[in-house]
Amino acid sequence: MDKLKDKVIWVTGASSGIGKELAYQLSKRNCKLILSARRKEVLEKVKNQCSNPKDVKILPLDIIEFEKADSYVEIAIDLFGKVDIQINNAGVSQRSLIAETDFSVYKTIMDIDYLGTVALSKAILPHFMLNNAGHYVVVSSLMGKFSSPYRSGYCGAKHALHGFFDAMRMEHEKHGVRVTMVCPGFVNTNIAKSALTGDGTLQESNDSATQNGLSTTNFCNKMITAIKKEKFEVYIGGKEVKGVFIKRFFPKLLHKLVLKSQVR
Ligand SMILES: NC(=O)c1ccc[n+]([C@@H]2O[C@H](COP(=O)([O-])OP(=O)(O)OC[C@H]3O[C@@H](n4cnc5c(N)ncnc54)[C@H](O)[C@@H]3O)[C@@H](O)[C@H]2O)c1
Protein backbone atom coordinates (compact mmCIF):
# COMPACT_ATOMS: atom_id res chain seq x y z
CA MET A 1 0.00 0.00 0.00
CA ASP A 2 1.19 3.53 -0.76
CA LYS A 3 2.54 5.01 2.47
CA LEU A 4 1.24 8.45 1.45
CA LYS A 5 -2.36 7.33 0.76
CA ASP A 6 -4.88 9.37 2.82
CA LYS A 7 -2.13 11.58 4.27
CA VAL A 8 -3.06 15.25 4.57
CA ILE A 9 -0.37 17.19 2.74
CA TRP A 10 -0.12 20.99 2.65
CA VAL A 11 1.88 22.31 -0.31
CA THR A 12 2.96 25.96 -0.55
CA GLY A 13 3.84 27.45 -3.94
CA ALA A 14 1.28 25.13 -5.51
CA SER A 15 0.21 27.47 -8.31
CA SER A 16 3.04 26.60 -10.70
CA GLY A 17 6.15 24.57 -11.46
CA ILE A 18 7.20 22.00 -8.85
CA GLY A 19 4.30 22.73 -6.45
CA LYS A 20 1.68 22.28 -9.17
CA GLU A 21 3.20 19.00 -10.37
CA LEU A 22 3.42 17.76 -6.75
CA ALA A 23 -0.31 18.44 -6.43
CA TYR A 24 -1.06 16.35 -9.54
CA GLN A 25 1.17 13.44 -8.50
CA LEU A 26 0.05 13.40 -4.85
CA SER A 27 -3.61 13.56 -5.86
CA LYS A 28 -3.07 10.47 -8.05
CA ARG A 29 -1.80 8.74 -4.90
CA ASN A 30 -5.05 9.58 -3.08
CA CYS A 31 -3.56 12.08 -0.70
CA LYS A 32 -5.72 14.82 0.79
CA LEU A 33 -4.26 18.11 -0.33
CA ILE A 34 -4.18 21.71 0.84
CA LEU A 35 -2.81 23.97 -1.88
CA SER A 36 -1.40 27.40 -1.07
CA ALA A 37 -0.01 30.30 -3.10
CA ARG A 38 -1.16 33.88 -3.56
CA ARG A 39 -3.62 33.64 -6.46
CA LYS A 40 -6.93 31.94 -5.60
CA GLU A 41 -8.09 31.54 -9.21
CA VAL A 42 -4.87 29.77 -10.25
CA LEU A 43 -5.10 27.44 -7.25
CA GLU A 44 -8.73 26.62 -8.22
CA LYS A 45 -7.49 25.67 -11.69
CA VAL A 46 -4.76 23.39 -10.27
CA LYS A 47 -7.32 21.80 -7.93
CA ASN A 48 -9.71 21.09 -10.80
CA GLN A 49 -6.93 19.44 -12.81
CA CYS A 50 -6.06 17.08 -9.95
CA SER A 51 -7.23 13.44 -10.23
CA ASN A 52 -9.28 13.76 -7.05
CA PRO A 53 -10.51 17.40 -6.77
CA LYS A 54 -12.93 16.55 -3.96
CA ASP A 55 -9.95 15.77 -1.74
CA VAL A 56 -8.20 19.02 -2.62
CA LYS A 57 -8.76 22.28 -0.70
CA ILE A 58 -7.21 25.61 -1.46
CA LEU A 59 -5.81 28.06 1.07
CA PRO A 60 -4.63 31.26 -0.63
CA LEU A 61 -1.89 33.05 1.27
CA ASP A 62 1.06 35.34 0.92
CA ILE A 63 3.92 33.69 2.74
CA ILE A 64 5.39 37.03 3.84
CA GLU A 65 2.32 37.86 5.94
CA PHE A 66 4.11 36.37 8.96
CA GLU A 67 1.59 37.74 11.45
CA LYS A 68 -1.13 35.60 9.81
CA ALA A 69 0.86 32.33 10.03
CA ASP A 70 -1.04 31.09 13.12
CA SER A 71 -4.42 31.74 11.51
CA TYR A 72 -3.36 30.08 8.21
CA VAL A 73 -2.30 27.01 10.20
CA GLU A 74 -5.60 26.99 12.12
CA ILE A 75 -7.54 27.08 8.83
CA ALA A 76 -5.31 24.38 7.29
CA ILE A 77 -5.87 22.02 10.23
CA ASP A 78 -9.65 22.62 10.12
CA LEU A 79 -9.88 21.70 6.41
CA PHE A 80 -9.28 17.96 6.99
CA GLY A 81 -8.96 17.83 10.81
CA LYS A 82 -5.16 17.51 10.72
CA VAL A 83 -2.00 18.06 8.66
CA ASP A 84 0.49 15.18 8.31
CA ILE A 85 3.04 16.73 5.96
CA GLN A 86 3.86 20.38 5.28
CA ILE A 87 5.73 20.85 1.98
CA ASN A 88 7.41 24.26 2.13
CA ASN A 89 7.99 24.87 -1.54
CA ALA A 90 7.11 28.55 -2.20
CA GLY A 91 10.12 30.53 -3.29
CA VAL A 92 11.61 33.18 -5.51
CA SER A 93 15.03 33.29 -7.17
CA GLN A 94 17.42 36.10 -8.06
CA ARG A 95 19.51 37.15 -11.07
CA SER A 96 21.74 40.10 -10.17
CA LEU A 97 25.31 40.77 -9.12
CA ILE A 98 25.85 41.88 -5.51
CA ALA A 99 27.16 45.30 -6.54
CA GLU A 100 23.97 45.94 -8.55
CA THR A 101 21.47 44.68 -5.97
CA ASP A 102 19.36 46.98 -3.77
CA PHE A 103 19.35 45.99 -0.11
CA SER A 104 15.53 45.80 -0.28
CA VAL A 105 15.85 42.86 -2.71
CA TYR A 106 17.81 40.88 -0.10
CA LYS A 107 15.08 41.58 2.42
CA THR A 108 12.32 40.44 0.05
CA ILE A 109 14.15 37.22 -0.83
CA MET A 110 14.88 36.47 2.82
CA ASP A 111 11.22 37.14 3.72
CA ILE A 112 9.85 34.80 1.04
CA ASP A 113 12.46 32.05 0.92
CA TYR A 114 13.42 31.86 4.59
CA LEU A 115 11.27 33.75 7.11
CA GLY A 116 7.93 32.89 5.45
CA THR A 117 8.76 29.19 5.69
CA VAL A 118 10.03 29.56 9.25
CA ALA A 119 6.79 31.35 10.24
CA LEU A 120 4.47 28.67 8.78
CA SER A 121 6.62 25.83 10.14
CA LYS A 122 6.81 27.27 13.61
CA ALA A 123 3.06 27.88 13.62
CA ILE A 124 2.27 24.22 12.82
CA LEU A 125 4.82 22.80 15.29
CA PRO A 126 2.40 22.60 18.28
CA HIS A 127 0.02 20.53 16.09
CA PHE A 128 2.82 18.14 15.10
CA MET A 129 3.94 17.88 18.75
CA LEU A 130 0.39 17.20 19.93
CA ASN A 131 -0.01 14.43 17.34
CA ASN A 132 3.48 13.12 18.10
CA ALA A 133 3.89 13.05 14.32
CA GLY A 134 4.52 15.48 11.50
CA HIS A 135 6.81 15.78 8.52
CA TYR A 136 8.37 19.00 7.24
CA VAL A 137 9.50 18.79 3.64
CA VAL A 138 11.52 21.84 2.65
CA VAL A 139 12.34 22.68 -0.95
CA SER A 140 15.77 24.23 -0.68
CA SER A 141 18.16 24.11 -3.67
CA LEU A 142 21.66 23.01 -4.57
CA MET A 143 22.17 26.75 -3.94
CA GLY A 144 21.50 25.89 -0.29
CA LYS A 145 24.67 23.77 -0.36
CA PHE A 146 27.01 25.86 -2.52
CA SER A 147 26.81 29.25 -4.20
CA SER A 148 26.84 30.74 -7.67
CA PRO A 149 27.15 34.29 -9.03
CA TYR A 150 23.94 36.30 -9.63
CA ARG A 151 22.12 34.51 -6.79
CA SER A 152 23.77 35.87 -3.60
CA GLY A 153 20.53 36.57 -1.69
CA TYR A 154 18.89 33.37 -2.89
CA CYS A 155 21.94 31.32 -1.85
CA GLY A 156 21.92 33.03 1.56
CA ALA A 157 18.24 32.29 2.15
CA LYS A 158 18.48 28.67 0.99
CA HIS A 159 21.60 28.05 3.15
CA ALA A 160 19.68 29.53 6.10
CA LEU A 161 16.86 26.99 5.65
CA HIS A 162 19.35 24.18 6.29
CA GLY A 163 20.53 25.83 9.50
CA PHE A 164 17.00 26.18 10.83
CA PHE A 165 15.60 22.81 9.80
CA ASP A 166 18.62 20.75 10.88
CA ALA A 167 18.04 22.23 14.36
CA MET A 168 14.29 21.53 14.06
CA ARG A 169 15.02 17.86 13.31
CA MET A 170 17.31 17.58 16.34
CA GLU A 171 14.94 19.35 18.75
CA HIS A 172 11.76 17.54 17.72
CA GLU A 173 12.69 14.05 16.58
CA LYS A 174 11.58 12.94 20.05
CA HIS A 175 8.13 14.36 19.24
CA GLY A 176 7.82 12.27 16.07
CA VAL A 177 8.77 15.22 13.86
CA ARG A 178 10.61 14.44 10.60
CA VAL A 179 12.46 16.83 8.28
CA THR A 180 13.35 16.20 4.64
CA MET A 181 15.48 18.82 2.90
CA VAL A 182 15.04 18.63 -0.89
CA CYS A 183 17.76 20.27 -2.99
CA PRO A 184 16.83 20.58 -6.65
CA GLY A 185 19.37 21.25 -9.37
CA PHE A 186 17.94 22.68 -12.58
CA VAL A 187 14.24 21.92 -13.04
CA ASN A 188 12.29 23.21 -16.01
CA THR A 189 9.90 25.74 -14.44
CA ASN A 190 9.37 29.50 -14.64
CA ILE A 191 11.65 30.14 -11.64
CA ALA A 192 14.10 32.19 -13.75
CA LYS A 193 11.26 34.25 -15.25
CA SER A 194 10.02 35.28 -11.82
CA ALA A 195 13.55 35.78 -10.43
CA LEU A 196 14.20 39.23 -8.94
CA THR A 197 16.79 41.51 -10.56
CA GLY A 198 18.87 44.15 -8.76
CA ASP A 199 16.06 46.70 -8.52
CA GLY A 200 13.43 44.17 -7.48
CA THR A 201 11.74 43.83 -10.87
CA LEU A 202 11.24 40.39 -12.41
CA GLN A 203 13.78 39.00 -14.89
CA GLU A 204 10.85 37.96 -17.13
CA SER A 205 12.94 35.63 -19.25
CA ASN A 206 13.87 32.00 -18.91
CA ASP A 207 17.45 30.77 -18.99
CA SER A 208 18.71 27.77 -20.92
CA ALA A 209 20.11 25.89 -17.91
CA THR A 210 16.69 25.89 -16.25
CA GLN A 211 14.86 25.06 -19.48
CA ASN A 212 17.22 22.14 -20.09
CA GLY A 213 16.77 20.92 -16.53
CA LEU A 214 14.74 17.96 -15.29
CA SER A 215 11.06 17.89 -16.15
CA THR A 216 8.80 18.61 -13.20
CA THR A 217 7.30 15.12 -13.67
CA ASN A 218 10.65 13.40 -13.30
CA PHE A 219 11.74 15.70 -10.46
CA CYS A 220 8.54 15.30 -8.41
CA ASN A 221 8.57 11.55 -8.88
CA LYS A 222 12.02 11.44 -7.27
CA MET A 223 11.03 13.95 -4.60
CA ILE A 224 8.01 11.86 -3.57
CA THR A 225 10.26 8.79 -3.23
CA ALA A 226 12.52 10.80 -0.89
CA ILE A 227 9.49 11.92 1.16
CA LYS A 228 8.27 8.34 1.51
CA LYS A 229 11.72 7.25 2.68
CA GLU A 230 11.83 10.19 5.14
CA LYS A 231 15.30 11.07 3.83
CA PHE A 232 17.13 13.77 5.80
CA GLU A 233 18.45 15.44 2.66
CA VAL A 234 18.26 14.70 -1.06
CA TYR A 235 19.87 16.22 -4.17
CA ILE A 236 17.85 15.88 -7.37
CA GLY A 237 19.11 17.12 -10.72
CA GLY A 238 21.64 16.43 -13.46
CA LYS A 239 25.43 16.53 -13.24
CA GLU A 240 25.26 19.79 -11.24
CA VAL A 241 24.42 17.63 -8.20
CA LYS A 242 28.10 16.59 -8.06
CA GLY A 243 28.83 20.15 -6.92
CA VAL A 244 27.66 19.28 -3.40
CA PHE A 245 30.34 16.62 -2.98
CA ILE A 246 33.05 18.64 -4.76
CA LYS A 247 32.32 21.62 -2.48
CA ARG A 248 32.58 19.39 0.59
CA PHE A 249 35.97 17.91 -0.24
CA PHE A 250 37.51 20.30 -2.84
CA PRO A 251 36.05 23.81 -2.26
CA LYS A 252 38.62 25.57 -4.49
CA LEU A 253 37.89 23.20 -7.37
CA LEU A 254 34.15 23.85 -7.00
CA HIS A 255 34.81 27.59 -7.09
CA LYS A 256 36.68 27.22 -10.41
CA LEU A 257 34.07 24.89 -11.91
CA VAL A 258 31.14 27.18 -11.07
CA LEU A 259 32.94 30.20 -12.57
CA LYS A 260 33.80 28.17 -15.68
CA SER A 261 30.21 27.04 -16.17
CA GLN A 262 29.17 30.73 -16.40
CA VAL A 263 25.53 29.95 -15.67
CA ARG A 264 23.71 33.23 -15.33
N1 LIG B 1 13.21 25.24 -10.87
C1 LIG B 1 14.43 25.11 -10.41
O1 LIG B 1 15.38 24.95 -11.20
C2 LIG B 1 14.70 25.14 -8.92
C3 LIG B 1 16.00 24.84 -8.49
C4 LIG B 1 16.26 24.86 -7.13
C5 LIG B 1 15.25 25.15 -6.23
N2 LIG B 1 14.01 25.44 -6.67
C6 LIG B 1 12.99 25.78 -5.66
O2 LIG B 1 11.79 25.10 -5.94
C7 LIG B 1 10.70 25.82 -5.36
C8 LIG B 1 9.57 25.93 -6.38
O3 LIG B 1 10.02 26.71 -7.47
P1 LIG B 1 9.62 26.41 -9.00
O4 LIG B 1 10.86 26.06 -9.71
O5 LIG B 1 8.44 25.53 -9.07
O6 LIG B 1 9.27 27.91 -9.48
P2 LIG B 1 7.86 28.65 -9.69
O7 LIG B 1 8.20 30.08 -9.85
O8 LIG B 1 7.09 27.96 -10.76
O9 LIG B 1 7.10 28.39 -8.31
C9 LIG B 1 7.24 29.20 -7.17
C10 LIG B 1 5.98 29.13 -6.37
O10 LIG B 1 6.13 29.91 -5.17
C11 LIG B 1 5.01 30.77 -5.06
N3 LIG B 1 5.33 32.00 -4.32
C12 LIG B 1 6.28 32.93 -4.60
N4 LIG B 1 6.21 33.95 -3.73
C13 LIG B 1 5.20 33.65 -2.86
C14 LIG B 1 4.62 34.32 -1.74
N5 LIG B 1 5.05 35.53 -1.34
N6 LIG B 1 3.61 33.72 -1.09
C15 LIG B 1 3.13 32.50 -1.49
N7 LIG B 1 3.63 31.83 -2.56
C16 LIG B 1 4.64 32.41 -3.23
C17 LIG B 1 4.64 31.09 -6.51
O11 LIG B 1 3.33 31.61 -6.61
C18 LIG B 1 4.78 29.70 -7.12
O12 LIG B 1 3.62 28.94 -6.86
C19 LIG B 1 11.28 27.18 -4.94
O13 LIG B 1 11.48 27.19 -3.54
C20 LIG B 1 12.61 27.24 -5.65
O14 LIG B 1 13.56 28.03 -4.97
C21 LIG B 1 13.70 25.45 -8.00
Locations of regions flagged by a protein language model:
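Conserved glycine-rich cofactor-binding loop
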Residues: 15-16
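The beta1-alpha1 cofactor-binding region of Rossmann-like NAD(H)/NADP(H)-dependent oxidoreductases
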Residues: 60-71, 103
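SDR active-site lid
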Residues: 174-238
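Residue(s) in the substrate-gating loop at a strand-loop-helix junction
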Residues: 141
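Active-site helix of classical SDR
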Residues: 121, 157
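Substrate-binding pocket helix/loop in short-chain dehydrogenase/reductase
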Residues: 97-98, 102-108
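Conserved glycine-rich Rossmann-like NAD(P)H-binding loop of the short-chain dehydrogenase/reductase
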Residues: 29-46
